[in-house]
From Swiss-Prot:
Cofactors that this protein relies on: Fe cation; L-ascorbate; ATP; Mg(2+)
Annotated binding of 2-oxoglutarate, by residue: K120, M157, H175, Q176, D177, W193, S266, R275
Name this polypeptide is given: Phytanoyl-CoA dioxygenase, peroxisomal
Coiled-coil region(s): none
Binding site residues for Fe cation: H175, D177, H264
Keywords of the record: Dioxygenase, Iron, Metal-binding, Oxidoreductase, Peroxisome, Transit peptide, Vitamin C
GO cellular component: peroxisome
């Protein structure tokens, strides 16, 4: 896509969303159900017909690979998630399998139990309070539009993006989430990502490249950043820099659903506060595992397996084993994953 086409695409996209400034999407309400009677189901590759999404919403996701639903998660639920995260940071609870991550710039001498040294917790499937996010009816109602009725919660995170230290390590390189997942098909996987407070470019909002979900999985590796890179923050090594970029400005409770091939990332947190969001990747329980040997995903397989072996002392663990352990059925029945 050349620069002119990218610019035209972005203009149409922003006009559709009613944005006032180029390069920024302000999350807006997208309720309402449109008739699909005149639109043949075979024309939809990425969404399923269940009378939740309007025709306009389905077309938007099909074309762009993401959809923002405003004010989806309540303030009360978000406060509960925040409280539980703080308990984890203080080491008052230690859920099985949970990974607590710190920014690469924080030295061991700064490991004081508080949210100020924790940049992310992931794999909270054994934390009853945080995992409630993955079972919220308002979340699953939309997830089913992409996965169908048998839904697995596969990957969970609560992100606490810290104020940048000046080394720009709080940013997340552009990447595709499918790079981390050894299961397919990609069209039956979706991420739900909920803002836990106001999020904009100043505190490191998501940036997406609309339409890139239609392309293939790209090779990923660690970017060569002078200030260092956080563990597992792989990025795409070569992508079309002429692609339009859209920054998602979101309010507390707003939720974006996006395809695992959508290229996205986030900027550094230039504010003095911690930017929080909670997310889960869901998949159709009918998805199947693949062997990533000989593919661009070999590097992430080796890294994940090495971490699990060192953390738990397992000798013969595979990437499939890791994801089978993480996965939880949240609606319908468990089938393949």
């Amino acid at each position: 896509m050349d620069r002119n086409r990218a610019s035209a695409r972005l203009t149409v996209l922003l006009r559709h969303l009613g944005c006032r400034s180029a390069g920024t999407i302000i999350a807006h309400h997208t309720s309402g159900v449109g008739s699909l009677a005149s639109f043949h189901p075979q024309q939809f590759q990425y969404t399923r017909e269940n009378n939740v999404l309007s025709l306009e919403q389905r077309k938007f996701y099909e074309e762009n690979g993401f959809l923002v639903i405003k004010n989806l998660v309540s303030d009360a639920d978000i406060q509960r998630f925040r409280n539980e995260f703080e308990r984890i940071c203080r080491k008052e609870v230690k859920p099985l399998g949970l990974s607590v991550m710190r920014d690469v710039t924080i030295t061991k001498s700064e490991y004081v139990p508080s949210e100020k040294v924790v940049s992310k917790v992931q794999d909270f499937q054994e934390d009853e309070e945080l995992f409630r996010y993955c079972t919220l009816p308002e979340i699953l109602k939309y997830v089913e539009c992409f996965t169908g009725p048998n839904i697995m919660a596969m990957h969970t995170m609560l992100i606490n993006k810290p104020p940048d230290s000046g080394k720009k390590t709080s940013r997340h390189p552009l990447h595709q989430d499918l790079h981390y997942f050894p299961f397919r098909p990609s069209n039956s996987i979706v991420c739900a990502w909920t803002a836990m407070e106001h999020i904009d470019r100043n505190n490191g909002c998501l940036v997406v490249l609309p339409g890139t979900h239609k392309g293939p999985l790209q090779p990923h590796d660690y970017p060569q950043w002078e200030g260092g890179v956080n563990i597992m923050f792989h990025g795409i090594q070569d992508y079309d820099k002429n692609n339009a970029r859209v920054h998602l400005v979101m309010e507390k409770g707003d939720t974006v659903f996006f395809h695992p091939l959508l290229i996205h990332g986030s900027g550094r947190n230039k504010s003095q506060g911690f930017r929080k969001a909670i997310s889960c990747h869901f998949a159709d329980a009918n998805c199947h595992y693949i062997d990533v040997e000989g593919t661009s995903q070999e590097n992430i397989e080796k890294e994940v397996v090495d971490i699990v072996r060192k953390k738990y002392g397992f000798k013969d663990v595979t990437l499939k084993d890791v994801w089978t352990f993480r996965g939880r059925v949240v609606k319908g029945e468990r089938i393949n994953l």
